[in-house]
């Protein structure tokens, strides 16, 4: 997958990320990855579900990856959960 087809989910409203996903597919992307960490994970799941159920009829979930990343903070190291949801055109 090309890294340009990745949407990083943060603190903006969900519909901003849905628009980014729909735009990627409308521009000819075969796959789009939605990535998030920590508190933004639920927003990433909402983004995928809204995009699939409301806007993208011919797109399916291909893979979902979950992991834990070690992040350096002021007080040491902490674990942060992350998710990657890969959407692809249905065949």
From Swiss-Prot:
Location relative to the cell: Cytoplasm; Chromosome
Taxonomic superkingdom: Archaea
Claim: Cytoplasm is one of the keywords in the record: yes
UniProt xrefs under SUPFAM superfamilies: AlbA-like
InterPro entries: Alba-like_dom_sf, DNA/RNA-bd_Alba, DNA/RNA-bd_Alba-like
Gene Ontology cellular-component terms listed: chromosome; cytoplasm
UniProt keyword Cytoplasm present: yes
Key words, A-Z: Chromosome, Cytoplasm, DNA condensation, DNA-binding
GO BP term, pick one: chromosome condensation
Primary residence: cytoplasm
Pfam family, one: Alba
GO molecular function: double-stranded DNA binding; RNA binding
Membership in a protein family: Belongs to the histone-like Alba family.
Protein name: DNA/RNA-binding protein Alba
């Amino acid at each position: 997958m090309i890294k340009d087809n990745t949407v990083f989910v943060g603190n903006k409203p969900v519909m901003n990320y849905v628009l980014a996903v729909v735009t990627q597919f409308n521009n000819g992307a075969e796959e789009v990855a939605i990535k998030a960490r920590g508190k933004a994970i639920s927003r990433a799941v909402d983004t995928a579900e809204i995009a699939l159920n409301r806007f993208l009829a011919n797109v399916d979930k291909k893979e979902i990856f979950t992991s834990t990343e070690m992040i350096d903070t002021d007080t040491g190291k902490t674990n942060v959960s992350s998710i990657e949801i890969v959407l692809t055109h249905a065949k």
